[in-house]
Amino acid sequence: GADAPVISAGNITLQATASVDQASLLLALPTARAQIRINGGQIDAAGSFAATASGNAAGGLTLLPLGVVVTNAEGSIAIGGDTRIDAASMALSAQSGVTAAILTESLAPDSSAADAAVAISTVNSTATTRIDGNAQITVAGVATMSAENTVTNRAEATPDTAAFGASLAVSVVRIDTAAEIAGDARVQAGSLGLDARTAADITLRAAATEGGATAPAEGSKTQQYLDDPAYGQQATTSEGTVSVVGALAISDLVSSTRAGVDSTAQTTVAGALDLQA
């Protein structure tokens, strides 16, 4: 409308960066979120329009008997509402990275029913570039939208000095990576490239104690995960579910990577259209 903000320049650059490192805390929640949101107004760039959002988080610990860390990272760009953008070229780039490492040693338990070592690492990582709503984007030349997600998660429970007890290593990872045009957004460009990439490296290790373990005690982390319907039912033998473990390692990975055009309005590309995921 008439009161909507207008930005006009030769080259226009928007940048959001967030980083955090909490790699030495027993219980940690490192979170890094970098977001760019455009929900209206007019942007006129005689040259380039560029937006970059980058979020990177590191969490973990070493040489301690118990580690529970939740690491969150996000780099996201969202252009929606009634936004109007006119530019000679456009580059939207979102990046998210997580490095988590939990390397625990012994709890020195007082019984074979107790936890001997526990390493639990949860990772949530999001990298998205999205044009939606009623946005109208006109780019004379090259328009690119990219999203890159990199996750490294390492959880190791090694009860080196414990004579008995169970060790538990858990990795829970959720990854969302997307470069999308959706809603009622209308895009016109000389060429258009949408690129979404995900890389995940997960290492999991739980080592049994020399003396082994008995049925885990109530309230122990091992008992908690054996009782969890999402995980406990997966630990089975030919005789049924498992109620006693010397070492338990659980890896739970859900990852989505998308690049696409799903708008109800027309997307017009004079030259090359490149979608990669």
Regions found by a protein language model. Give the residues of each.
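Low-complexity, glycine- and small/polar-enriched segments
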Residues: 1-277
